[in-house]
Amino acid sequence: MEMYNFMINEGKGPVSEKFIALNIHDFDAASTFIAGLSYKRNQDKNNILCVFEDKGGTCSTKHAVLRKLALENGQDSVKLMLGIFKMDSKYAPSIKKTLDQYRLAYIPEAHNYLKIGNHYYDFTKPGSGYNDFKSNLLSETEIEHDQITLEKITFHREFLRNWLDNERIGYNLEEIWSVREKCIEDLQKPTKEEPETNFSPVCFQNSPEVRDEYK
C-alpha cells in the first residue's frame, strides 16, 4: 500500500512551521518522525505542539498533531479516529490472570489512529499497525485533534457503561474501570510472551506512563 502524502507549506499554521523548522517537508516524513518519537506522557495534552516540546507523546497526541498538520494544509481526508477494541488474553497474555480473576473474556480498551480514505494508519510507534487490533475492534468514531482529553475519556466510559448493561456484566462502571487499570499494570510487567523490547501497536502496552493517559 502506497503511503498517502502531501507537501507541507509555509505559513499554514504552527504545526506546519514546527515540521518545516525540522527540515521535514511532507506528510510521509512527518508521520515517520512522529512514530519515531518516544512514547511518553505529555505535560499538557491540550497544547497541540506538546509532542515537539516533550520530544514524545501518546497515541492521542501523536495522531492529533498529524490531523492538525493535515488540516493546516487543506487535507481534510486525514481523519483522527478513536477506536474501542477487545483487549483479551490472546492479544495480551499478561492480562490473563486478571481477566480470569474477574471472570472476563476481555475488556474494551481505547486507541487513537488515522483513517485516510479507506486505509488506516497507526503512527504510535515504528511498526505499529491497524491490522494488529482490527479483528478485535468493537467500535470507532471520528474525533477532532482538540477532543483527545475529556471527550476521549467520556466516550470510553460511556462505551463501558453500555457494554456492562448489554452484556449483563456483574460490575459497575467504577469497578470495571479499576479492573482495566489492573490490566494496564499487568501490561507493564514484561513476560516471556511479551518481552520488554516488544513494541505493541496499541498505545498503552509496556509504557510506564500509560496510566497518566486517563488522568
For the regions a protein language model found, what residue spans apply to each?
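Secondary-structure boundary elements
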Residues: M1-G57
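His-Asp-centered catalytic microenvironments across diverse enzyme cores
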Residues: M3, M7-L22, Y39, G83-K215
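Short Gly/charged-rich anion-binding patches and loops
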Residues: A29, V65-K68, E109
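Proline- and acidic/polar-enriched loop/turn elements at helix boundaries
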Residues: N46, L82-G83
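Short N-terminal helix-initiation segments at or just after the protein's N-terminus
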Residues: C50-A64, T191-P201
